[in-house]
A protein has these predicted regions:
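Short amphipathic beta-strand segments in non-cytosolic proteins
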Residues: 54-64, 173-186
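N-terminal targeting signals for Sec/Tat export/insertion, comprising classic cleavable signal peptides
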Residues: 29-60
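Short, ordered, surface-exposed loop/turn motifs in non-cytosolic proteins
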Residues: 46-50, 167-177
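Beta-strand-rich domain onsets/edges
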Residues: 22-32, 103-158, 163, 167, ...
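Sec/Tat signal peptide C-region and signal peptidase I cleavage site
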Residues: 15-23
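Bacterial N-terminal signal peptides
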Residues: 6-16
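Glycine-centered loop-to-beta-strand initiation motif
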Residues: 70-75, 189-203
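Short acidic/polar inter-strand loop motif in beta-rich domains
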Residues: 91-99, 213-218
Length: 239
């Protein structure tokens, strides 16, 4: 199949959007599973209380609570026993662009001369082990793997489907290697929200997508901006 990647570098608007599109994913940090907030290779500090929910999933599809451990500049997560996947939601609050073009973490009514305001929500789905058969959960934005990534290897095809509020989202490109090549994008999703990617890394893989929903009746913001990721780490043999 064709594996055409488009770089948004040629389009100033797309570059600006990508630069602002921080996401979250989970990754091992000193033996713990950390909730990482950043863009590309960036690993930024954040207030751990912004993590609003972490749910573990068993192979049966059952949901279980996960334990969130607040640290000084981030949060760790302890998935439920036997969890094969988990979802994380981080509410980054409302960001308003002032008359000087700079954004502040305040609602529109508190910024004189505000140009625009957006409520930023970050969502992650992490595949922990083989056997995860996830379905859309109805979140504002999510990426669902249509094949078990943990059974694949680098270079293998990985079909995915994008959903917004539980419905397939057509016409959006995905960031195919968000950590290592943060501007590389896939072809756009088809009418069913589907697109076939390929596994980029023999290790941590993070795939991202962004989508905004207008809020015309809300005086404090103009839209809700979602950034969702699908992440997984291919298993390695024992050293």
């Amino acid at each position: 199949m064709l594996r055409q990647l488009s770089l948004a570098l040629a389009v100033a608007g797309a570059l600006t959007s990508a630069a602002q599109a921080h996401g979250i994913w989970t990754a091992q940090r000193h033996g713990d599973l950390a909730i990482v907030y950043g863009h590309g290779a960036g690993d930024d500090a954040y207030k751990p209380e912004k993590v609003k929910g972490v749910v573990s999933y068993l192979a049966s599809g059952e949901r279980r609570d996960s334990k969130v451990l607040h640290q000084a500049k981030n949060a760790l997560v302890e998935p439920a026993q036997d969890a094969v996947a988990l979802t994380v939601i981080l509410d980054n609050g409302v960001w308003t662009k002032g008359p000087d073009g700079k954004s502040v973490n305040q609602p529109k009514s508190q910024v004189p001369g505000a140009q625009s305001a957006s409520h930023s929500i970050k969502i992650n789905t992490t595949i922990l082990k083989s056997g995860a058969t996830l379905k859309p959960t109805g979140q504002g934005l999510e990426i669902v793997a249509l094949a078990d990534p943990m059974t694949l290897k680098m270079g293998d095809d990985l079909p995915v489907q994008v959903f917004a509020d539980g419905k397939p989202l057509a016409g959006v490109p995905l960031y195919v290697d968000y950590v290592n090549d943060g501007h590389a994008q896939s072809n756009k999703t088809d009418q069913d929200g589907k697109v076939t990617l390929f596994v980029r890394n023999d290790g941590l893989n993070v795939i991202g997508v962004s989508h905004a929903k207008k809020t015309p009746d809300n005086a404090e913001m103009d839209q809700v901006s979602y950034f969702a990721t699908l992440s997984f780490t291919l298993p390695h043999g024992e050293d």
